[in-house]
């Protein structure tokens, strides 16, 4: 574990340096503005002050000081930048994250796991993430982990991600349309064992269920064209219109992490998607209560 | 007092230059990031474009000549120079139109690929400037028949500056669009 | 003597808006003073509209998970708020001051091209109206004021909003270029004999340099807009990555305009401050040459810093480093100016009028904006804080705390000249303190919101620690600003109803605009003093203590 190279620590350190210098400068400006404004306020019968046109030496001294300060910060900047963004020449990413309007797709390259929105990473390990976008520009930002990276269609961007064990939240940071504010990021940094368990559970097929509701739901999933936007196979990259729903029930949240993954929420969502999330691409399918029940049951079995 | 009109025209074309720089940058940028363009550039008729370039450069010369004639009060020479300029620039525009028609026949259009988008936008905006120039020269030319006395030096020199600018922009366009892919 | 330009209008007093017969004359006017006032009124009109939009934004964000307006409407509102404030409030406001004052300050009686001047105004005006017409034509643009492609492309923004945005901005852009051409030629050709370029009042100098920035920057925006329009209307593929276009090129075009634009909005403001502070300190500007030269430095550097808006798009460290260096450099001439303004106050005799207080408030608030701006040159900090509320706070400290405060200072300073009446100082103080308190309440805490992780342009947010209270204070501040503007409008109305009492030179000023009646007659001047220094009226009033002769 090398904390010196962790993004947020470098950023924090630089920000503290900046804050100290900026506070001093701002303090001086405030002090002199108020102090001069008070001390040299016009008094009755005041004489005209001496007409002082300035001093070249003073100006050059000031420019020199400003130049020195900025030079120091420039060196610090270049240093910090090189520490944070040191991507190898032919990067081989561990995770490929693709932005969609408005959800996140994650592909674990070595295991070819495709999942969405709930993204697990091994804790305390540098993970190389590749970013790209399927439609418009999005931006990845988890404030606690430091640095954001835009997801630009047509470009591959790379970034090192490292986190302590725990859950981290963020929101898309480049304006990407109607649901920009609800495009939340949820990262879970698992311990080594937990990550292995999670991975193997993703690779296993979901437990078989013998229930008429399950069969109806599975059939409806095909018939009601859910399948043309959502895959239920963990390895399927296509179709990419909606998130891959394999092991959907194992996720804590859904809808780009804005709703808890409960039966009620899921029911309300499938019943009338635009009511839950306006402008969503998921259409209102005019399903009967029975059909929705069966679909919810089916999806909930995808553990 | 200095010649305000000419000064205005200088700054205006300075500003316009930035506009064309942006369009040329877009063209060059797209040529470099996509591979499709090189196959498409093979469809451009470079020899004809070279002839057209000569036409435009000559028209700049003839406009200069007719301005000199105007200053010396040689009406006939002025009219002659203006008509040569008009003919040459119309030939240039005609050539451009033929180029467009040929490209459209080959299914290379504005909305086909990024080459089409950037090529037609760049040359289209240049042609727009040529047409504005032809109109301005045409107005001066017709004035020389109707009310020659009303023609003023400022108007002619402003149009002349503008026309040279259009010419120079074309040289850059010609270089980046037609010559560069051959190098 | 060829002191005067020949203009067609007869030599009569300025038509008044109270006079029924002359009301139409404003429509056809080519007089720079009337056009200047119309620019300022246009700016005020859109300032009110943009302000109301800001109130909707703050109301929506006052509490977490609010549903006061829908996401789509919120996006229209914040897009229009940004676009309005930048293109229809600050730009015409500063151009209006320039159009009114530059001929007066250089002793001319008109702009170089009066008709072009009127054309520029009306084009800007119609551009603004066209932009607002989008509300009635299927919805305003929803892609933000920088309208990033491909979000602004047809597949992702199918309504006509973006098309209105493009056309509106093209028109106002043409208007700005027209005004800039006029400024440049006016300053170059119509100066009173004896005024050398090195002797210009700083407001004139900065607007002059600014005009070059406009001439260089707006065509780049226009080129980008034209490409976007061709994409949307003629199905070209410039900014559509799925068909070989580039999403990044738009950003390069936009910001290579956008960053000079930031300076376009602040340089004339610097000019106003450089006029107001000396007059109310009874001292000449400290280090004229440095203030003037730093303006040129800013203008040149401003074309080389644009990509610091794009550090997060994934450029290489070399490119980032270059733009970081230029962004650091541009901070230095800006700092020089602040030092010189404070230096002007040193050992002065400071009269705290509303105009001067606005200038002092500007000094402090603009410094905050300038410093937070420098933090974006520190690339890792930018990576963390760009596109967060920290940026929102920063731009408002620059645009509102910088440009708008100095416009207010300028309006209180020059109002007697414009209208022959003094704005009430008492109401002015109310306006100032309500507005300044509200402004700092609204935006100072937004720095912290950004650091805590609130992204910009979100219409709703989770109830995270501190988010609600900080946003609530922010909204409360917006209401104080609203009240401040209301006081300002009331002040304008009651002042315009009072009798004109202003003397030609109420502030004991030094530049030529104070050498004529308030408001000036149609041809501006009856007689003009000979000019031998930067402060012609000072020389006139203090014959035994003249400034150094410069010509």
Language-model features: locations:
Chain A
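Signature tryptophan residues that serve as conserved aromatic anchors
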Residues: 102-104, 195-198, 269
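Extracytoplasmic entry segments of secretory-pathway proteins
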Residues: 1-125, 206-207
């Amino acid at each position: 574990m090398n904390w010196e190279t962790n993004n947020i620590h470098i950023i924090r350190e630089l920000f503290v340096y900046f804050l100290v210098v900026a506070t001093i400068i701002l303090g001086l400006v405030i002090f002199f503005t108020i102090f001069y404004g008070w001390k040299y306020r016009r008094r009755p019968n005041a004489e005209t002050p001496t007409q002082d046109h300035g001093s070249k030496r003073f100006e050059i001294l000031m420019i020199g000081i400003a130049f020195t300060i900025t030079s120091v910060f420039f060196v610090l900047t270049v240093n910090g930048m090189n520490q944070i963004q040191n991507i190898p020449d032919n990067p081989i990413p561990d995770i490929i994250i693709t932005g969609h309007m408005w959800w996140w797709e994650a592909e674990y390259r070595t295991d070819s796991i495709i999942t969405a929105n709930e993204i697990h990473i091994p804790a305390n390990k540098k993970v190389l993430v590749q970013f790209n976008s399927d439609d418009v520009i999005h931006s990845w930002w988890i404030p606690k982990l430091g640095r954001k990276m835009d997801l630009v269609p047509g470009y591959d961007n790379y970034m090192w991600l490292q986190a302590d064990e725990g859950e981290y939240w963020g929101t898309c940071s480049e304006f990407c349309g109607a649901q920009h504010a609800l495009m939340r990021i949820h990262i879970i940094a698992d311990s080594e064992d937990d990550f292995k368990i999670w991975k193997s559970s993703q690779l296993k097929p979901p437990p078989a269920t013998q229930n008429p509701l399950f069969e109806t739901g599975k059939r409806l999933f095909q018939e009601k064209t859910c399948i043309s936007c959502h895959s239920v196979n963990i390895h399927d990259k296509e179709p990419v219109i909606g998130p891959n729903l394999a092991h959907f029930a194992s996720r804590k949240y859904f809808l780009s992490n804005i709703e808890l993954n409960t039966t009620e929420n899921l029911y309300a969502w499938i019943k009338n998607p635009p009511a839950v999330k306006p402008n969503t691409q998921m259409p209102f399918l005019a399903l009967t209560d029975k059909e929705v029940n069966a679909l919810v049951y089916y999806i909930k079995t995808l553990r | 007092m200095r010649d305000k009109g000419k000064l205005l025209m200088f700054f205006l074309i300075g500003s316009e230059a930035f506009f064309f720089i942006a369009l040329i940058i877009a063209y060059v940028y797209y040529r470099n990031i996509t591979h499709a363009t090189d196959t498409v550039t093979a469809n451009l008729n470079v020899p004809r474009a070279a002839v057209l370039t000569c036409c435009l450069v000559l028209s700049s010369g003839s406009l200069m000549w007719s301005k000199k004639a105007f200053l010396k009060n040689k009406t006939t020479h002025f009219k002659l120079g203006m008509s040569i300029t008009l003919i040459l620039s119309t030939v240039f525009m005609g050539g451009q139109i033929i180029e467009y028609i040929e490209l459209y026949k080959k299914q290379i259009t504005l909305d086909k690929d990024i080459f089409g988008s950037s090529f037609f936008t760049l040359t289209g905006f240049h042609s727009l400037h040529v047409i504005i120039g032809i109109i301005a020269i045409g107005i001066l030319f017709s004035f020389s028949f109707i009310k020659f006395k009303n023609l003023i030096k400022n108007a002619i020199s402003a149009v002349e500056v503008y026309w040279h600018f259009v010419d120079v922009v074309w040289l850059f366009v010609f270089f980046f669009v037609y010559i560069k892919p051959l190098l | 003597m060829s002191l005067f330009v020949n203009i067609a209008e007869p030599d009569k007093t300025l038509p008044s808006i109270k006079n029924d017969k002359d009301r139409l004359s404003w429509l056809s006017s080519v007089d720079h003073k009337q056009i200047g006032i119309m620019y300022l009124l246009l700016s005020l009109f859109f300032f009110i509209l943009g302000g109301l939009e800001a109130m909707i934004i703050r109301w929506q964000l006052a509490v977490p998970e609010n549903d006061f307006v829908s996401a789509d409407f919120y996006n229209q509102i914040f897009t229009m708020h940004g676009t309005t404030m930048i293109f229809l409030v600050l730009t015409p406001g500063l151009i209006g001051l320039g159009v009114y004052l530059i001929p007066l300050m250089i002793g001319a009686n008109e702009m170089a091209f009066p008709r072009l001047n009127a054309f520029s105004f009306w084009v800007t005006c119609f551009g603004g109206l066209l932009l607002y017409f989008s509300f009635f034509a299927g919805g305003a643009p929803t892609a933000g004021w920088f309208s990033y492609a491909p979000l602004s492309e047809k597949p992702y923004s199918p309504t006509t909003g973006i098309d209105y945005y493009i056309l509106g901005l093209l028109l106002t852009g043409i208007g700005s270029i027209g005004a800039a051409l006029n400024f440049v030629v006016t300053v170059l050709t119509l100066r009173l004999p004896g005024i050398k370029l090195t002797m210009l009042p700083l407001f004139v100098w900065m607007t002059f340099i600014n005009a070059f920035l406009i001439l260089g920057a707006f065509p780049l925006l226009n080129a980008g807009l034209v490409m976007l329009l061709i994409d949307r209307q003629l199905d070209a593929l410039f900014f559509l990555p799925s068909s070989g276009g580039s999403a990044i090129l738009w950003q390069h075009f936009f910001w290579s305009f956008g960053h000079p634009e930031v300076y376009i909005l602040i340089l004339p403001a610097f000019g106003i401050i450089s006029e107001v502070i000396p007059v109310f300190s009874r001292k000449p500007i400290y280090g004229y040459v440095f203030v003037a030269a730093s303006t040129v430095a800013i203008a040149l550097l401003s074309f080389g810093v644009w990509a610091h808006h794009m550090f997060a798009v994934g450029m290489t460290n070399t490119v980032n480093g270059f733009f970081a260096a230029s962004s650091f450099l541009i901070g230095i001439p800006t700092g020089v100016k602040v030092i010189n303004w404070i230096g002007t106050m040193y050992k002065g005799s400071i009269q705290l009028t509303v105009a001067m207080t606005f200038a002092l408030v500007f000094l402090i608030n603009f410094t905050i904006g300038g410093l937070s701006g420098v933090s974006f040159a520190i690339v890792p900090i930018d990576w963390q804080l760009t596109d967060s509320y920290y940026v929102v706070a920063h731009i408002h400290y620059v645009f509102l705390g910088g440009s708008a405060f100095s416009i207010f200072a300028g309006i209180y300073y020059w109002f007697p000249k414009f209208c022959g009446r003094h704005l009430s100082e008492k109401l002015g103080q109310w306006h100032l303190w309500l507005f300044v308190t509200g402004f700092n309440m609204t935006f100072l805490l937004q720095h912290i919101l950004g650091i805590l992780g609130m992204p910009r342009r979100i219409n709703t947010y989770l109830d995270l620690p501190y988010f609600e209270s900080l946003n609530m204070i922010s909204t409360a501040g917006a209401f104080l600003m609203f009240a401040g503007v209301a006081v300002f409008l009331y002040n304008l109305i009651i002042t315009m109803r009072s009798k004109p009492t202003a003397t030609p030179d109420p502030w004991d000023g030094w530049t030529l605009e104070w050498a004529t009646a308030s408001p000036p007659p149609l041809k501006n001047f009856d007689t003009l003093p000979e000019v031998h220094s930067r402060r012609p009226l000072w020389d006139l009033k203090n014959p035994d203590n003249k400034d150094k002769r410069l010509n």
